[in-house]
Swiss-Prot record:
Classification via CDD domains: RRM_like_XS
InterPro entries: FDM1-5/IDN2, FDM1-5/IDN2_XH, XS_domain, XS_domain_sf, Znf-XS_domain
Function, as annotated: Acts in association with FDM3 and FDM4 for RNA-directed DNA methylation (RdDM).
Keyword Ribonucleoprotein set for record: no
GO biological process: gene silencing by siRNA-directed DNA methylation
Highest taxon listed in the record's lineage: Eukaryota
Protein keywords: Coiled coil, RNA-mediated gene silencing
Cited Pfam families: XH, XS, zf-XS
Identification of the protein by name: Factor of DNA methylation 5
Segments forming a coiled coil: 254-469
Gene name for this UniProt entry: FDM5
Length: 634
């Protein structure tokens, strides 16, 4: 039989109460088969792995889907609602109801027991005649009879004194379930076998005061006269087997409905938690994607600025070489001109005066060119020093913070270009200010200088924006790690691959092993272990104890645990290498993750690789656990 009718369209939540009548009719007509031999099946979930249910299991399944399954459609809810109604109305008699074990040997006796009217909760009656040798106070003690009848497991015992016949009446009360009926039946059977049943008590044959009589309390006892009947009517009531069975069925139906509602509510809560978890996972994934994109853009921008910086430096060196060649050519021309002037002879005073003026002018020009050459040389030296200094700083910063220092490198190169242009402008001020070519060149260099300053400001703005984005991303990652540590602390154990580890706490296993090897008695080993572990945990947290040393040089210099420390050596000699390594590991963790506080801090940990877990590993692990949980629920 198919799970649903193809000819019927989907329905809304508000139509469930109306639509369920159609599948209910088909269930009544036998179109859907529910009961197969001694088991039950869901005709609307034929594709599921489980096909055989008990009555209670199928009723709980149908009620849970009808009332609370968020993953089911309204049509499926209506079908299961009809199935639950059908089972409650038509198949209630097929429910597994426990029947009492009636201790009799024949069918007629069993039917007679079932048809009897009993006092409920189940009670027995024991009559003990008091003889002259008996202690009346002992026989009236309830504790005495609780101990004497302990093999029948009574809940409590009531004793009554029947003055008319001088007997003690004992009324034990039993469990109201079928186990209580079994106990009171065993009591009655035991007394009947000894010939001390209710009939024997009524007949009172022979030496009847020498024996105790017992039987199960029934309607005759309840409706009789006397203190026994008064007590029975006070604490109990008359019930038949059919009444008790019906009440049991009703109670079980109520329990099943309650459990179905709880299952539905639990499923709804689980779906909400799963939705929240998916939201958090997607948020973390978006943060990581944004961070990766920022890193990619940052690297591209850094590479682009480096290429621009190299190109500009090469252009500066080419321009410097060209200016140097021009200066040398002019100096050579001046030398040739000076030699020519020296060779000329002044024919007249006017010519000599003109010649003197030309010489002075030549000397002034030569002096200016020499000063300009010296200034250019100084500027070149400064440029070379700036380049060398920039290279040295670049190598140092790459070992510390590669990405940010690459931006600073570009910024420094641009500043160097600006200084170079300022130097050139300063040199040109010493040249002939009336030269139109020099003026145009100075104007062009000023414009280029302004362009470089604007470009430097743009670089600084870009660098500031990238640094703000990076700080924001880092803050979000830190908050994400804190959130994961808080949420996962109660959800994972030390056996999980991804877990929350308290960095700086001692590993207890080496201490326990060492104490057990030294102490043969387990209790002594436990005490020794607790004292030793507590002592060294406090020692590790003590900031005054600094068992560290520095190894390596320069950038490779780092701080490690000094195994030659007196306390460390003493611990190794007394308790062995494994205990020493446990203390060493705790010190290294504190020195790495909390060097200032010297107290343990929680951290996401990859147990498989023995290192700090990345956010990507934690998210992948959570996703895998959610998928596993879905498969188990399915």
């Amino acid at each position: 039989m198919d799970n649903s009718s193809d000819e019927e369209s989907e329905i809304s939540e508000s139509e469930i109460d109306v639509y369920y009548e159609k599948p209910y009719e088909k269930l009544m007509n036998g179109d859907y088969k529910v009961k197969v031999k001694d088991t039950f099946r869901c005709p609307f979930c034929a594709g599921k792995k489980k096909q055989h249910y008990k009555y209670k299991e199928l009723l709980a399944h149908a009620s849970g889907v009808a009332k609370g399954s968020a993953s089911r459609s309204a049509k499926q809810k209506a079908n299961h609602f009809a199935l639950a109604k059908y089972m409650e109305n038509e198949l209630a008699g097929d429910a597994d109801v426990p029947r009492p074990q009636i201790p009799s040997s024949s069918t007629e006796q069993s039917q007679a027991v079932v048809d009897d009217i009993y006092v409920w909760p189940w009670m027995g009656i024991v009559i003990n005649p008091v003889r002259r040798t008996d202690n009346k106070n002992v026989l009236l003690d309830s504790a005495y009879w609780l101990k004497k009848l302990a093999r029948f497991n009574p809940l409590e015992v009531k004793t009554l004194w029947l003055d008319q016949e001088s007997v003690v009446a004992v009324i034990p009360q039993f469990n109201s379930g079928w186990s209580g009926f079994k106990s009171v039946t065993e009591l009655e059977k035991e007394y009947e076998i000894r010939g001390c049943g209710r009939k024997d008590w009524i007949d009172k044959r022979g030496d009847w005061r020498s024996k105790a009589y017992g039987w199960c309390a029934r309607a005759d006892d309840y409706n009789s006269q006397g203190s026994i009947a008064e007590y029975l009517s006070k604490v109990g009531k008359l019930r038949s087997f059919s009444d008790i069975t019906k009440e049991e069925i009703q109670n079980k139906s109520i329990v099943v409905d309650d459990l179905a509602n709880k299952i539905a509510m639990t499923n709804e809560d689980l779906n909400k938690l799963q939705y929240m978890n998916n939201e958090k996972t997607l948020s973390l994934r978006r943060v990581l994607i944004e961070k990766d994109e920022l890193d990619r853009v940052y690297k591209q921008e850094t590479k682009k600025m480096q290429e621009l910086s190299r190109e500009k430096i090469n252009r500066i060196f080419r321009e410097k070489e060209r200016l140097t060649n021009e200066l040398e050519a002019k100096m050579n021309n001046l030398k040739i001109w000076s030699k020519q002037l020296d060779k000329k002879q002044a024919l007249t005073e006017l010519e000599r005066q003109k010649l003197d003026e030309d010489k002075k002018k030549s000397d002034v020009m030569n002096s200016s060119l020499q000063l300009a050459s010296l200034e250019q040389k100084k500027t070149d030296d400064r440029v070379l020093r700036l380049v060398d200094e920039h290279k040295r700083k670049k190598e140092e910063t790459l070992n510390k913070i590669l990405q940010l220092e690459k931006e600073l490198d570009s910024k420094q190169k641009l500043q160097m270009e600006i200084q170079e242009l300022k130097g050139k402008l300063k040199v040109m001020k010493h040249e002939d200010e009336d030269d139109e070519g020099i003026k145009k060149k100075m104007k062009k260099m000023k414009e280029e200088l302004e362009e470089k300053c604007s470009e430097l400001q743009d670089l600084e703005d870009t660098n500031s924006a990238l640094m703000v984005k990076e700080r924001k991303s880092n803050d979000e990652i830190v908050e994400a790690r804190k959130f994961l540590i808080t949420e996962l602390r109660e959800l994972v154990s030390d056996r999980n691959i991804i877990r929350v580890k308290r960095m700086g706490e001692l590993e207890e296993k080496p201490f326990m092993t060492a104490c057990r090897q030294r102490c043969t008695v387990e209790e002594e080993a436990q005490v020794q272990y607790a004292m030793l572990c507590s002592k060294w945990q406090e020692k590790v947290k003590d900031s005054a104890w600094q068992p560290f040393k520095h190894v390596g040089t320069g950038d490779r210099k780092k701080e490690v645990v000094d195994e030659e420390d007196e306390e460390i050596k003493k611990l190794r000699e007394e308790w062995g290498e494994e205990v020493k390594n446990a203390v060493k590991t705790a010190l290294e963790e504190l020195n790495e993750f909390n060097p200032s506080g010297r107290y343990s801090v929680p951290e996401l940990w990859n147990s498989k690789q023995g290192r700090k877990a990345t956010l990507k590993e934690v998210i992948d692990y959570i996703t895998q656990q959610v998928k596993t949980l879905k498969r188990r629920r399915a």
